[in-house]
Amino acid sequence: MPPKRIAKRRSPPEDAIPKSKKVKVSHRSHNTEPGLVLTLGQGDVGQLGLGESVLERKKPALVPLLQDVVQAEAGGMHTVCLSQSGQVYSFGCNDEGALGRDTSVEGSEMVPGKVELQEKVVQVSAGDSHTAALTEDGRVFLWGSFRDNNGVIGLLEPMKKSMVPVQVQLDAPVVKVASGNDHLVMLTNDGDLYTLGCGEQGQLGRVPELFANRGGRQGLGRLLVPRCVLLKSRGTRGRVRFQDAFCGAYFTFAISREGHVYGFGLSNYHQLGTPGTGSCFIPQNLTSFKNSTKSWVGFSGGQHHTVCMDSEGKAYSLGRAEYGRLGLGEGAEEKSIPTLISRLPVVSSVACGASVGYAVSKDGRVFAWGMGTNYQLGTGQDEDAWSPVEMTGKQLENRVVLTVSSGGQHTVLLVKDQAQS
């Protein structure tokens, strides 16, 4: 009898508790189509994944060791890839732990290496020095660190970075993760937005300006403990629920279930579509995106500009214009409202790097524009492109482009052979 009593008292291990409630999460942002990974641009810290001898690529190059990849994301100086079987691979700068794996063997950060996670992952996101992974049952694992203007602020605990994945404690299952340079946004299946990381520019949407610098008197816990972005719903007692969220470097876009576009964070060049250039510390209902004929389906933000697309496959840009990053043609100036990029075919997705923009066309071609300095445009030259240029190269022949993602100095493409499409 006594052993039975002991057994009764024993509480189940923590990770076993939610099993009864486990759900398989889904969201339209989860990619399931497998492909090959191509990289281009600067790779001096291994972010191209091509080994120690390749520090630059002017045209897309095939990353070896990676097959059946369904998502390829460029962080600031690292790259994260998700395989069809739900495993995560990383390469690039690991100074702050953004790779989530041991890179003590010289050169091991320059080629793809597996991140040890027991769970099947369905989505990844990457910032300047952090990476997030969303599991099929809606849990989020995070590694690396967040920084502000004064340096490292920590990851989930003040001043502590993590070189390996740690679980983010949240009650609700998450369906999507998105990363800015130094903040993370998590969308739950209930339509709530949780944010954490640096809040200096308002990008968390829940920390007043007074406390945005290192959390004020409450300290960094205010920033690093994920909390919900609360926004009262007009005319009802409830709060606004969201269906999607996207990040720029220092700002966030969120689309409500009713289709309204909200934004918060840095808008010093009107990159949020706000009439003014002040930072927004609470979500703003962005009237510049109100148009009864359009629904907005995709956003991507660089350092000071935004590229977005509507449900008809048209691409638009707004924000800072230097170096041609808006793709609106020679001499274009700053835009405070979404402005049609007319020289593009129908697009299926858009993306931004720090000072560049991209669009993938419905028929699988990729177009690039903006700053040419880092060879991120795939033109083979370092000149800026003020209008979209179709990317070409040996590795793009007889292939269709599925997605594009861009970091500070490098760009990552997911492609597949034409015969398979």
Curated annotation (Swiss-Prot):
The modification N-methylproline is found at P2. Keywords: Cell cycle, Cell division, Chromosome, Cytoplasm, DNA-binding, Guanine-nucleotide releasing factor, Methylation, Mitosis, Nucleus, Phosphoprotein, Repeat. GO terms for cellular component: chromatin; condensed nuclear chromosome; cytoplasm; nucleoplasm; nucleus; protein-containing complex. The modification Phosphoserine is found at S11. SUPFAM superfamilies: RCC1/BLIP-II. The modification N,N-dimethylproline is found at P2. GO terms for biological process: cell division; chromosome segregation; G1/S transition of mitotic cell cycle; mitotic spindle organization; regulation of mitotic nuclear division; spindle assembly. It is found in: Nucleus; Chromosome; Cytoplasm. Gene3D superfamilies: Regulator of chromosome condensation 1/beta-lactamase-inhibitor protein II. RCC1 repeats lie at residues 34-84, 85-136, 138-189, 191-257, 258-311, 312-362, 363-416. A motif (Bipartite nuclear localization signal) lies at residues 4-24. Residues 1-36 are annotated as: Disordered. N-terminal methylation by METTL11A/NTM1 is required for binding double-stranded DNA and stable chromatin association. Dimethylation produces a permanent positive charge on the amino group, which facilitates electrostatic binding to the phosphate groups on DNA, while inhibiting histone-binding. Methylated tail helps retain RCC1 on chromosomes during nucleotide exchange on Ran. Pfam families: WD40_RLD. One of its GO terms (molecular function) is sulfate binding. Residues 1-10, 19-29 have a biased composition (Basic residues). PROSITE patterns: RCC1_1, RCC1_2, RCC1_3. InterPro entries: Ran_GTPase-activating, RCC1/BLIP-II, Reg_chr_condens. Guanine-nucleotide releasing factor that promotes the exchange of Ran-bound GDP by GTP, and thereby plays an important role in RAN-mediated functions in nuclear import and mitosis. Contributes to the generation of high levels of chromosome-associated, GTP-bound RAN, which is important for mitotic spindle assembly and normal progress through mitosis. Via its role in maintaining high levels of GTP-bound RAN in the nucleus, contributes to the release of cargo proteins from importins after nuclear import. Involved in the regulation of onset of chromosome condensation in the S phase. Interacts with RAN. Interacts with KPNA3. Interacts (via N-terminus and RCC1 repeats) with KPNA4. Interacts with ARRB2; the interaction is detected in the nucleus upon OR1D2 stimulation. This is Regulator of chromosome condensation.
